[in-house]
From Swiss-Prot:
UniProt protein name: UPF0637 protein RBAM_014510
Superkingdom, taxonomy of origin: Bacteria
Family: Belongs to the UPF0637 family.
Record InterPro entries: UPF0637 (IPR009403), UPF0637_domain_sf (IPR053707)
Length: 210
């Protein structure tokens, strides 16, 4: 099987100084792996969600000065794009990798979906494992572990999605670089698939409002 696990060199790409040098290595080393992950997991996500899912590898085309701090492949039920749609992501920063379900700032269903999340909060905390994390901003590496949050903190994230124009909501797993490097390829792929199986619950909720 083709090796798709992220390596130390993949993570180190995001420590290279300068836009052009970093983008060169990103295109040569990381992007082919993201493409393979996209091809590998699109059928899995299609089966889990009931929607045909298409992979979109981040291009970072609009950057002219600052190099990207992370990169990813996203999956959505459209060939044309993903940012306005509920979607999944696999990606990495220099310190960790992530597997996300995401509703980001361009989504038109945020308010309605936020209300549904609030109504389904008890179900969500049962379906989503405690070690999964939540984030209100895809551009920042930090996140909150669900087991460390009380119900009020989680509710605040759902309310924010309804009321703040630029609000986002992401849920998933973060794996530290050292843990990923020590996995074999099968463990890596299985970890991602297991996360997607749990996160598909959040996607199916979007099908009630989109």
């Amino acid at each position: 099987m083709t090796q798709m696990r992220f390596t130390k060199e993949d993570f180190d790409t995001f420590t290279i100084e300068g836009l052009d040098p970093r983008m060169e290595v990103l295109k040569e080393q990381v992007r082919p792996k993201l493409t393979l992950l996209g091809e590998h997991f699109a059928p899995t996500l299609s089966a889990l969600t009931g929607d045909e899912m298409f992979p979109h590898v981040a291009k970072h085309a609009r950057r002219s000065v600052n190099p990207p701090a992370d990169s990813w492949v996203a999956f959505a039920n459209s060939k044309r794009g993903y940012k306005k749609l509920p979607h999944f992501q696999i990606g990495l920063w220099d310190t960790h990798m992530f597997v996300w379900f995401a509703i980001i700032y361009e989504s038109p269903i945020k308010e309605e979906y936020g209300r549904l999340l609030e109504a389904k909060q008890e179900d969500i905390t049962k379906q989503i494992p405690g070690h999964f994390v939540w984030s209100p901003d895809h551009t920042k590496p930090g996140a909150y572990k669900q087991s460390d949050m009380d119900q009020e903190q989680l509710k605040t994230l759902f309310e924010r999605l309804q009321t703040v124009k630029k609000a986002e909501l992401l849920c998933g797993i973060q794996l530290q670089k050292e843990d990923v490097i020590n996995m074999n390829n099968n463990e890596f792929l299985q970890t991602i698939e297991d996360a997607f199986r749990k996160l598909s619950f959040l996607y199916t909720l979007t099908q009630k409002v989109s």
